[in-house]
Amino acid sequence: MENKVHMAAFSGMGAAPTPMAFPELFSALQQGVVDGQENPVTVITASKFWEVQKYVSLTGHVYSPAAVLASPVLLDGLTEEQRGWFAEAAKASAAATRAEVNRLEEAGVALLRENGMEVITDIDKAPFAALAEEASYSVYTDQYGGEMIERIKAVE
């Protein structure tokens, strides 16, 4: 997936991002066309990238939230009590999803190690986070303007 923010972040880290179709990635790693790839642990294990790469660094530079969404029409049709149930179910779903993602990642890291990959976890994540944040804002400043970016930054 070619994502402008990811491209800017990796360029800022000194890499030369090379977007390509995912089905081409394994052979590109195998042939040395690219030196690395960026994917969730579950994708790395499913693709058996341990066959074509030796290292994986768990930088935590991307967080992909999963939102629970509902239309105003649906929510407006619920009673106050039902909206409360909906909110409780959404929170429970979020907690269960996060727990499952963590479980899958832990199992995936173990599988990577079992298959000979060196998993690097002792990483100073602050520089990665700062570069990713800066890239996120810089990519969209021209499109939306500095004032909008500052309003977004102010949201907690």
Q: Where would I find each of the regions flagged by the language model?
A:
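N-terminal secretory/targeting leader peptides
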Residues: M1-E156
